[in-house]
Structure formats: structure tokens, C-alpha cells
Amino acid sequence: MDLDQIVADAQQSFEGAADITTLENEKARFLGKSGALTELLKGLGKLDPETRKTEGARINVAKQQVEAALNARRQALADALLNQRLAAEAIDVTLPGRGAGAGSLHPVMRTWERVEQIFRSIGFDVADGPEIETDWYNFTALNSPENHPARSMQDTFYVDGKDADGRPLLLRTHTSPMQVRYARMNRPPIKVIAPGRTYRVDSDATHSPMFNQVEGLWIDENVSFADLKGVYTDFLKKFFERDDILVRFRPSYFPFTEPSAEIDMMFEHGKNAGKWLEISGSGQVHPTVIRNMGLDPERYIGFAFGSGLERLTMLRYGVQDLRLFFENDLRFLRQFA
């Protein structure tokens, strides 16, 4: 038996295989059930013990050489296939890069951050509170009586469960509950804004079931309505970055302030010139609310205001439909990037 010839033939056959399928077929000629080396191993049983031992060792060495040649060719074909695939996917580094588009803040979040920045610059703290609120903090503490229409299911989202004192839970209808929460944890003078999400059963071009609001509160011994007018007028001029803004305070009613006022603004120039635009509710904090804060209404007084962040954003950017802020249309949002 010429084992050297078998090994040489196998190496030559493997080297000539152009692909894995051909290589596996060539492998069967030498290592398959009827392969040359397999037949030699089957024939060892006919030999005497001494010869069988010697020939068996020679055949095993030849088999190892054939398997080594087979594995080497397999690796070479795999490497060639990989190189071919990489070449097909090659990147021309001389081409101009496409780049990834940079993200940007949502326009309402831009307003949120801008409002915080402006009020921080004039000494206000920024606070946050729970969106799932108790009936007491959302209504009772703010001087809303038990039979107030806002407590109805048609205006307020109530949730299952009650608080530790057995009071109903709801999605807060405004950020005003933070007035009482913050004042109970801090002593006057209190200057704070509380931006956050609020919820009401309402949906049209100017209202959304979920909207963002910023509450402002200033409590001290000698805070007047004149301070409210000065602070809010200065805020509007900084927010809109223009001085041609007229502000008026219309008498109104809110259970948590007395006197109460709606704040309107008007631009002297531009496409909205001459139009009064409702911007916020405000007023002097009601003595009952101050008492619920744990403070003496005979000593402390202050003002509060509540402004819709979507409303401010609509006026700043000239958006006509509030619902556009919630549709996640990139064509709309990219305008503010």
C-alpha cells in the first residue's frame, strides 16, 4: 500500500477544490465510508498481529496528514469567502460622510426650560410634585368647596384607590397643589415656580387632556398685587425677547385667589399687533389657602399665577393648533430644531 501516494493525491485534490461542496466530495474519496484510507483500515483485520500494529500506525499517520490538509483547505476557503464579502461591503472612506442628524428639544420642553431659567434669574426656586394627587391637595386645600363643578367626573380624571387617610386620588388638574405642599415644607419668604404635567377631561384645538402648566407663588409679609404685575410683565418681556408688550389684568374668579385676575398681553407690533391674548390666571393667595399652608393669613400674603406652557409656546412660535405638539410629526418638530 502506497500511503505516501494516497496522502499526495488527497493534498492535491483538496488544494484543487474551488468551493466547500467540491472539498466535501473530495473528502469522501479518502475519508468517507468507502474512502481509500477507510478501506485500508478495514483490511487490517486480515493481517497478523505484528503487521497489523505496524501498518495501523502508518495508516493513522497518513490519516492525520490528510485531515490536516482538509482542514487547511477549509480554512482557506472560509477566509476567501469572508474577504469576498468584506470587499463587497467595503466603505469608500474618501466619500463624504452622511452623518447622523442631531436631535433637539421638543418646543414645549424648550419653553419649560426657558421659563425655569427666567424665574431662577430673579430668585425663584423650582419645585416638583406628584401627578397623582389627593382630592384634598388638589381641591380642598385650595378653597374649592365640596360641590365645586371641577370635582365632577366630567372635568377630572379620578383613579382607583385612596390615600393613607382614605381620601380619593386623581390626576392633578393644575400644578397649584404644589403651593400648599411647598409652603408646608418651607418657611417664608417663599418664591417658587412649579412646572409640570396636568390633566383634564378636555380635547380640542386649544385644549388637551394632558397639558403642561407652570405655577408661580410668592409669599411674604408685604407682597402686593403690584409685585405680581411687575414680576409677570418682566417675565413676558424676557420670554418673548421684546419690550413692546402691553399687559392687562382683567377681574376674574378663582377659588384659591382673592382678588383674582386673568392676565392678557398684547404686542404693539407684528401680525398680532392690537390683539389681546389670554396668557394666564393669577391673583392674591386666598387667606384660607394660606391657612392651609400652615401660615398665619394675618401676617403673610402673596400672589400666585398659573400659565399653560403650550399656550406660551403657541404664542412664541405662532402655532395655531395645540394638538400639533402631541402628534410627533417630525415635519412639524424639525422646524424648532
From Swiss-Prot:
Q: Which GO terms describe its biological process?
A: phenylalanyl-tRNA aminoacylation
Q: Name one GO molecular function term.
A: ATP binding
User: Sorted alphabetically, which CDD domains does this protein's record hold?
Assistant: PheRS_alpha_core
Q: What is its EC number?
A: 6.1.1.20
- For this protein, what reaction is catalysed? tRNA(Phe) + L-phenylalanine + ATP = L-phenylalanyl-tRNA(Phe) + AMP + diphosphate + H(+)
Q: What residues bind Mg(2+), as annotated?
A: 258
**What keywords are annotated for this sequence in UniProt?**
Aminoacyl-tRNA synthetase, ATP-binding, Cytoplasm, Ligase, Magnesium, Metal-binding, Nucleotide-binding, Protein biosynthesis
Iron-sulfur recorded as keyword:
no
Residue stretches in coiled coil: none
Superkingdom of the organism of origin: Bacteria
Q: Which family does it belong to?
A: Belongs to the class-II aminoacyl-tRNA synthetase family. Phe-tRNA synthetase alpha subunit type 1 subfamily.
Q: Which PANTHER family match?
A: PHENYLALANINE--TRNA LIGASE, MITOCHONDRIAL, PHENYLALANYL-TRNA SYNTHETASE
Question: Which protein is depicted?
Answer: Phenylalanine--tRNA ligase alpha subunit
Q: Which organism is it from?
A: Burkholderia pseudomallei (strain 1106a)
> What would be the name of the gene that encodes this protein?
pheS
